[in-house]
Amino acid sequence: MQLLDNLDAALRKLDAQHLRRRRRTAESPCAPHVRVDGRDMLAFCSNDYLGLAAHPVIVAALAEGAARYGAGSGASHLISGHSHAHAQLEERLANMLAPHLEQPRALYFCTGYMANLAVLGALAGRDADIFSEALNHASLIDGARLSRARVQVYPHADLDALADMLAASRAQTRLIVSDGVFSMDGDIAPLRDLLALAERHGAWLVVDDAHGFGVLGEHGRGVLEHAGLRSPHLVLMGTLGKAAGVAGAFVAAHATVIDWLVNRARPYIFSTAAAPAQAHALMASLNLIEGSEGRQRRARLQALAQQLQARLSLRQWRHQPTPTAIQPIVLGANAHALRAAAGLESQGLWVPAIRPPTVPPGTARLRVTLSASHIPAHVDRLADALNQLDNEACHA
């Protein structure tokens, strides 16, 4: 059949470019030590930054929520799927972020991808201008495209270029859209400067804090707390399946923005609500994040990142130290990244290669992600293996 032949040819082309992707099967809970395809591995690739995914308090809360509310919601939020657990979670998130938003409310989504499509589709339209960061996540890129707004991409962290674009815009509705923590690089957006530009030009600042929420700030409130921001111009998206350890995402903003999303955000309106048990479990997760245990876990995570940075002595590869859990090591060629990942796997270390289109061509990398559940001995083992492989690459 010609249609299948065309797909087979396209897959063979991906193989030739070292770009074909295949799934691995984890057979154990998310933790530093995992069983993958029948083999025990030490993982440095999950987004479980605080090590909460298998926390007994959260696991117990999930079971309690399932016993109380059942396995599923049964309908969308605007029909009969909006449970007491969802309402409690949204109120809890709004209160948590109240120091950074005026008249805050929150909206719970099934995924971060859905949340970003919802925000950009509802706030922008044909007559709007979106100014999108060059290294934004795919969900922000797709959300901007689907909004039908005019999209301009500004170079990574280039505030002068963004200021020029804003000054030239004549649109009544303008949105500056940026990751808070860049998912493949681990650096933090210059949010204070972005907010200053948004307020000066009467624009929304939409921040995707998928990798900062729970990790950054004294109370784990993410990049807004880290940068000390408060403004009615802010629209925040955060994920709840990474540092929070469960699933889903939220949008937090001024109450009027949230009311508009409830009425106009198609991904929210036309999707079955997430299981109430997840929302119930997330209440336990947020208590841990904001409490003393959360502070201890964030401090441990920072110490592990500093340890890795101090222990690496790379000559051929390029490590980009960051203040977050994401520590990228750029190798360049796709084949080199795959070879390095295979070399680590042969030593029982799971660090997948990240290749285009996830990262720009020529910047294939190992994306090392740390968790508060790691211990210093884990980091030493990883650093020794990376230094060894880098040394071998120098002499290849």
Curated annotation (Swiss-Prot):
GO terms for molecular function: 8-amino-7-oxononanoate synthase activity; pyridoxal phosphate binding. GO terms for biological process: biotin biosynthetic process. Substrate binds at R21, H137, T358. It comes from the Bacteria. Keywords: Biotin biosynthesis, Pyridoxal phosphate, Transferase. SUPFAM superfamilies: PLP-dependent transferases. Its EC number is 2.3.1.47. NCBIfam families: bioF. Catalyzes the decarboxylative condensation of pimeloyl-[acyl-carrier protein] and L-alanine to produce 8-amino-7-oxononanoate (AON), [acyl-carrier protein], and carbon dioxide. This is 8-amino-7-oxononanoate synthase. It comes from Bordetella petrii (strain ATCC BAA-461 / DSM 12804 / CCUG 43448).
